[in-house]
Structure formats: structure tokens, C-alpha cells
């Protein structure tokens, strides 16, 4: 059964991308999108999905069937096309010893919108393709400046904003990945201590696919006045995904997650946020609201949401945290 995509219209995606005949996207309902799965097999179990999803994220096996199997099939087509192009370019350049570099998938979106769940589920699905590709997953958290530096520069309340990341290190990492270098080091981050872990790295050794997840990975920057060439993080992506939802929903998810963490991870005395587990529920909720409005909402408006139109694919979630529409950029 063929499915006719509709052009994106005002209101289909929050923030309104270009509508009508000049739209750069096709938009599908979740049910329409699910039919693109075709014969893609379901290779995850319900228990595995529970293990992969983040706290307070209700994504289940049904959502994997509806959304992720079709997305897996689409990404398989893109990876296959990149491999064909690579072989053609090798012949064109007469470079028989050239090695294919990783296919890099960027995943962006607000805090609490479900980026990590999407990244982990995709990583598992892609690794279980018949070709058994090697898939690695990296988050941008490890590229944040250590808390000591953020505190020194009075930037702790700007954590997660573009200036709180070591962009130089991040770009060097991606450059090495795309150069095909082996054993590239990525710094690691502890959500328990809310800080980069000193001298601890994740080694990325020439995977077939690298998933790179973070709130600002589609961020662009002003061109430098001196005219120097400055690459953007997204310049290294072969495919990009933006996880979207109405602002009010993300707000509710963020506060709800904070309150759940107060009852779980924050109980650990080593947690950076342990102090929030000892105050009243009303006081904790007020703090969560303050963090949302004073930090995360500002970051969403100023830096994250404006990058949405740069994505190849936009997953728009509804109140249940499940995807309602899928926008796919036209070729």
C-alpha cells in the first residue's frame, strides 16, 4: 500500500517550518510512518526496551514497532547509499586502499524530551541488522567543561549552553572519527556527580555507525570576524534527528523527572543533587520549576529549538511521550 506524504503545514510541527509547496519536509502521522517498516524484523524484546529507556520515559515495544523499525529501515537505506557512493568515489580517485569512515548520526533536542532513549534504542536496532555493523554511542556530556572550570568562570547556571562545552575538543574528536583514526578517546561524564570524570575515556575504534547525542549538536555559530574556517559539529553528520514536543509537555516531563530522581538517584549521598532529596516535596518542586524557567527553557529558546529546521528528520512527541508525527526532509 502506497502512502502519500503531505507537505508540512503550519501547526504540524511546533514553531512552524516553511509550509505549503515550498516545504522542505514530508510529514507523516505515526500510523502512516509505521507502514514503512515493511518486513523489517523486530529484534528487541519488551524487557530490553525497558532496560534501554530513560527514567520516566514510557516508550515500549509498541512504539518501537510504530516508529523505530521504519526509522531503522530508512537509516539502513542511507548507510547502504553512503557505502555505494564510497565505492564509486574510490574508483573515481583510483584509491584502492581507502577505508570507509563511520556513518555518523546526530540526535538533538531539549532536556527531558527522550534523546537518550531514542539513541539507545536505535543503537541496539542498528547493531542487529543482518550485516551486524559495529555501532557506538557517544553523548556530548563528556565534552562539557569540568565543574571546576564552570565554577571559576561563573558558568554553572549556563551548563548545557553552547559556551559550557569544550567545542575544540568536540571538533577534534569528530574530525578524528571522520578521518578514520583508530581508538579515538571520548571523555566520559557522571550524572551522579554531575561532572566530567577525570582521566576516564570511552575508546571509539572505527565503528561502522556512530550515534552522537546531545542537546546542541545541530548548533551553528556566527562566522568569525577574522575569516578563519570554523567547522560546525553538524558538518560531520551523515544524518540528523531532532526530538521535538510542545514546550508545555517538555516542561512537565522535566519537572516530573526531577521529582522521580529525588526519590531515586538523588538519595545517593554521593549525588551532586543529594541535598534535594532531604527537602520537602513542595520545595523540591519549586527548585525544579526554577531550574526549568531560568536555565533549560532559556537554552531551549535561544539555542536548541532554532536548530530544529536543520534536522533531516523530526520526531514530534505528544502528551503520552509517544511520537505523533514524523517529518522527513525531502531529497
UniProtKB/Swiss-Prot annotation:
Q: Which UniProt keywords apply?
A: ATP-binding, Coenzyme A biosynthesis, Cytoplasm, Kinase, Nucleotide-binding, Transferase
Pathway in which the depicted protein is active: Cofactor biosynthesis; coenzyme A biosynthesis; CoA from (R)-pantothenate: step 1/5
Q: Name one GO cellular component term.
A: cytoplasm
Molecular function per GO: ATP binding; pantothenate kinase activity
Subcellular location per the Swiss-Prot or TrEMBL entry: Cytoplasm
Name the residues that bind ATP.
109-116
EC number(s) on file: 2.7.1.33
* Any one GO BP annotation for this protein: coenzyme A biosynthetic process
- What top-tier enzyme class does this entry carry? transferase
Sections of the chain in a coiled coil: none
Q: Keyword Glycosyltransferase: yes or no?
A: no
Spell out the Pfam families in the cross-references.
Answer: PRK
**InterPro entries hit by this protein:** P-loop_NTPase, PanK, PRK/URK
User: What is catalyzed by this enzyme?
Assistant: (R)-pantothenate + ATP = (R)-4'-phosphopantothenate + ADP + H(+)
Record family assignment: Belongs to the prokaryotic pantothenate kinase family.
What is this protein identified as?
Pantothenate kinase
Q: Which organism is it from?
A: Sinorhizobium fredii (strain NBRC 101917 / NGR234)
User: Lineage of the source organism?
Assistant: Bacteria, Pseudomonadati, Pseudomonadota, Alphaproteobacteria, Hyphomicrobiales
Gene from which the chain derives? coaA
Amino acid at each position: 500500500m502506497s502512502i502519500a506524504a503531505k507537505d508540512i503545514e503550519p501547526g504540524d510541527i511546533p514553531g512552524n517550518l516553511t509550509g505549503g509547496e515550498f516545504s522542505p519536509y514530508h510529514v507523516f502521522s505515526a500510523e502512516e510512518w509505521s507502514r514503512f517498516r515493511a518486513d523489517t524484523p523486530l529484534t528487541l524484546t519488551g524487557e530490553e526496551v525497558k532496560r534501554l529507556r530513560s527514567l520516566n520515559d514510557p516508550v515500549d515495544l509498541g512504539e518501537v514497532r510504530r516508529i523505530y523499525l521504519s526509522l531503522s529501515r530508512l537509516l539502513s537505506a542511507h548507510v547502504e547509499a553512503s557505502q555505494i557512493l564510497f565505492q564509486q568515489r574510490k574508483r573515481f580517485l583510483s584509491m584502492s586502499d581507502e577505508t570507509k569512515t563511520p556513518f555518523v548520526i546526530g540526535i538533538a533536542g531539549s532536556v527531558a524530551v527522550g534523546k537518550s532513549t531514542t539513541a539507545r534504542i536505535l543503537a541496539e536496532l542498528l547493531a542487529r541488522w543482518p550485516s551486524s555493523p559495529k555501532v557506538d554511542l557517544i553523548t556530548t556530556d563528556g565534552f562539557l567543561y569540568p565543574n571546576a572550570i564552570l565554577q571559576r568562570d561563573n558558568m554553572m547556571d549556563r551548563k548545557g549552553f553552547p559556551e559550557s562545552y569544550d567545542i575544540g575538543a568536540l571538533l577534534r574528536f569528530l574530525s578524528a572519527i571522520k578521518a578514520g583514526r583508530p581508538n579515538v578517546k571520548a571523555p566520559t561524564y557522571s550524572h551522579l556527580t554531575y561532572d566530567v570524570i577525570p582521566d576516564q575515556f570511552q575508546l571509539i575504534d572505527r565503528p561502522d555507525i556512530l550515534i552522537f547525542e546531545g542537546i546542541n549538536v545541530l548548533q551553528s555559530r556566527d562566522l568569525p570576524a577574522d575569516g578563519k574556517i570554523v567547522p560546525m559539529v553538524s558538518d560531520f553528520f551523515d544524518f540528523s534527528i531532532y526530538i521535538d514536543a510542545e514546550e508545555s509537555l517538555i516542561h512537565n516531563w522535566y519537572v516530573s523527572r526531577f521529582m522521580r530522581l529525588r526519590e531515586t538517584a538523588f538519595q545517593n549521598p554521593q549525588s551532586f543533587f543529594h541535598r534535594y532529596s532531604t527537602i520537602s516535596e513542595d520545595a523540591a518542586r519549586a527548585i525544579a520549576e526554577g531550574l526549568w524557567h531560568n536555565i533549560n527553557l532559556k537554552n531551549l529558546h535561544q539555542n536548541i529549538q532554532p536548530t530544529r529546521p536543520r534536522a533531516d528528520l523530526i520526531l514530534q512527541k505528544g502528551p503520552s511521550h509517544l511520537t505523533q508525527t514524523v517529518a522527513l526532509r525531502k531529497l
